[in-house]
Design a protein with these regions (language model features):
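Long, mid-chain structured domain cores
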Residues: 59, 66-82, 86-98
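N-terminal, charged low-complexity regulatory/assembly segments
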Residues: 29-31, 50-65, 73
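Active-site environment of non-heme Fe oxygenases that use a 2-His-1-carboxylate facial triad
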Residues: 2-47, 52, 97, 101-103, ...
Length: 308
């Protein structure tokens, strides 16, 4: 069976590569799909979303900001075939995370840290997504166990920051393509089962998350999966020359124009849904009024969005 991600299958890779590059160059507007009702996308809207995700592994959604509610998000993602949620540390009972910069003394409704701090010493401000600081390139859930990897996620903007907060997005398949073209050894190193280790997260003697060891690139049910963080702290790379070379190539990749980085400052009513593509975020400045501060809703899934 043809597998373009098998380094020994040169012909299968060449065919896949040609098909992949047909869609590029592309702009963020090429990902855009207006959706009238988030809780009930029409067959045409669903088809348009899946078509973009099939090509780019992501789509941009435009909806009425008032429609961005927990149950609407769950209905929308179920319409795309996503069922198994990833109940991460600060998600609510429906697996929805409210992403905002943590405030020590929240007073307004909608502040994500109001009553959401778990026991054991973990606080929202300890985690970069819940601050106004920049987020380096990563895929979601890179610290999850191998059998609990994040396959897809959605992210919707309820309120924008006063300034900043630009997202960068790169299709992980395009990253794979450029790295493999540079050297198949990069792929071999990053596909090693011990390529990237994330130490356990322990606070006050309580293990909040076990250690995670695994590859950067893997193939799951025939599809490419990427597990990556550009962070310098709390990550351990396999100590080999090939791994260091592959890491350096990845670092260079993020400034290359031919990897086709999509950039977006999300506005209220805009959303992203993706098969866990590479993404980053610049720092931002919030409004002093908590009721006007940046707020996004996110759900992670163990499933992947499949083409019809």
């Amino acid at each position: 069976m043809d597998n373009p991600f098998d380094l020994s299958q040169i012909s299968a890779y060449s065919d896949w590569r040609a098909r992949k590059l047909e869609a590029y160059p592309a702009e963020i507007t090429d990902l855009r799909v207006p959706v009238r009702r988030l809780d009930e996308p029409t067959p045409a809207e669903r088809t348009a979303l899946k078509a973009r995700i099939d090509i780019f592994n992501m789509a941009m959604v435009e909806v009425d900001p008032a429609g961005i509610q927990t149950q609407a998000l769950l209905s929308f993602t179920r319409a795309l075939g996503l069922q198994r949620t990833d109940a991460n540390l600060f998600a609510d009972a429906s697996a929805v995370s409210r992403i905002a910069a943590s405030r020590r003394n929240p007073s307004a409704e909608g502040c994500v840290d109001a009553g959401s701090e778990p026991p054991g010493g973990a606080t929202l401000g300890d985690f970069l997504p819940y601050t106004d600081k920049p987020l380096s390139w990563h895929t979601d859930g890179y610290y999850n166990a191998p059998d609990e990897q994040v396959g897809a996620w959605c992210l919707f903007c309820v309120r924008a920051a006063r300034d900043g907060g630009e997202n960068g997005l790169i299709d992980h398949e395009m990253a794979y393509l450029r790295l493999r073209d540079e050297s198949p050894q990069h792929i071999a190193a990053l596909a090693h089962p011990q390529a990237l280790s994330i130490p356990a997260h322990v606070q006050e003697g309580r293990t909040l998350r076990a250690a995670s060891v695994g590859p950067v690139f893997s193939v799951r049910q025939g599809y490419l999966h990427m597990r990556y963080s550009a962070r310098a702290r709390h990550v351990i790379w396999r100590d080999t020359p090939d791994t260091y070379a592959a890491r350096a190539a990845l670092d260079r990749l993020f400034s290359r124009p031919d990897v086709f980085t999509f950039k977006l400052v999300m506005k209220p009513g805009e959303g992203l849904v993706s098969n866990n593509v590479l993404h980053c975020r610049t720092g931002f400045a919030d409004d002093e009024d908590p009721s006007k501060s940046r707020l996004l809703y996110r759900i992670r899934f163990l499933d992947r969005i499949l083409a019809d």
